[in-house]
Amino acid sequence: MSNSKSAPQDNLFATPIANLGDWRFDEKVAEVFPDMIKRSVPGYSNIISMIGMLAGRFVTPHSQVYDLGCSLGAATLSMRRNIDVAGCKIIGVDNSPAMVERCQRHIDAYKAATPVEIIEGDILDIDINNASMVVLNFTLQFLAPDNRQRLLNRIYQGLNPGGVLVLSEKFSFQDKQIGELLFNMHHDFKRANGYSELEISQKRSMLENVMLTDPVETHKSRLHQAGFPHAEVWFQCFNFGSLLAIKGE
């Protein structure tokens, strides 16, 4: 399960690191990111595929599509493959220079009718307007909690009536027993994909101050507060999942 022919294998944490520090999406992470996320996030490839299918349903002519926290552009490419209407544009945004550089290369390698603009910047500063679809694919969890509602409010305001937000996240759980079980099953998943206990432990230590997760109930509450009348989990595997939020017509 751990072999990846399309990208270098993630062995960044295979040996002890004296001063771990906090997680950063730097050049080293960007280089191995496809292998890392495939082996670390259960259901990731399914979510990416389904985001493309959702684009085929929700993207309307002469509208804009946003991939906020686009990393290497997997969701952007999936949407572009499935958009079959005229006059659309996809805008991908990420604050990591290493991710943006590689993302642009990936976008340039696959020509398609729908134009794509990749922006290096803070998603909190991006103007969202005339949007038929917005994707936050494992991005919100890296924002300061105080900024999360503000971003969702701006997304809601920038969406056209009937537009959709896809919000994928790692979840925490109010039920501690369920939370512990799914946490442990996720670690089983990573072990089955070839990660050692050292790799799992070091990565977790680097992420614990940077990636702050919320329960599904909190996500739904924020989405409803932003104005979305419809919000529900459409995909979940262990403690990873994705919600759909649809703006009223």
From Swiss-Prot:
Entries under CDD domains matching the protein: AdoMet_MTases
Residues the record lists as binding S-adenosyl-L-methionine: Y44, G69, C70, S71, D94, N95, D122, I123, N137, R204
The protein's enzyme class: transferase
Catalytic activity of the protein: prephenate + S-adenosyl-L-methionine = carboxy-S-adenosyl-L-methionine + 3-phenylpyruvate + H2O
Biological process per Gene Ontology, one example term: tRNA wobble uridine modification
Molecular-function GO terms, alphabetical: carboxyl- or carbamoyltransferase activity; S-adenosyl-L-methionine binding
Superkingdom field: Bacteria
Transferase among keywords: yes
Alphabetical keyword list: S-adenosyl-L-methionine, Transferase
Record-linked InterPro entries: CmoA (IPR005271), Methyltransf_25 (IPR041698), SAM-dependent_MTases_sf (IPR029063)
EC number: 2.1.3.-
SUPFAM superfamilies, per the entry: S-adenosyl-L-methionine-dependent methyltransferases
Protein's UniProt keywords contain Ribosomal protein: no
Function, in words: Catalyzes the conversion of S-adenosyl-L-methionine (SAM) to carboxy-S-adenosyl-L-methionine (Cx-SAM).
Family label: Belongs to the class I-like SAM-binding methyltransferase superfamily. Cx-SAM synthase family.
NCBIfam families, per the entry: carboxy-S-adenosyl-L-methionine synthase CmoA, PRK15451.1
Quaternary structure and partners: Homodimer.
Protein name (record): Carboxy-S-adenosyl-L-methionine synthase
Protein species of origin: Proteus mirabilis (strain HI4320)
Lineage of origin: Bacteria, Pseudomonadati, Pseudomonadota, Gammaproteobacteria, Enterobacterales
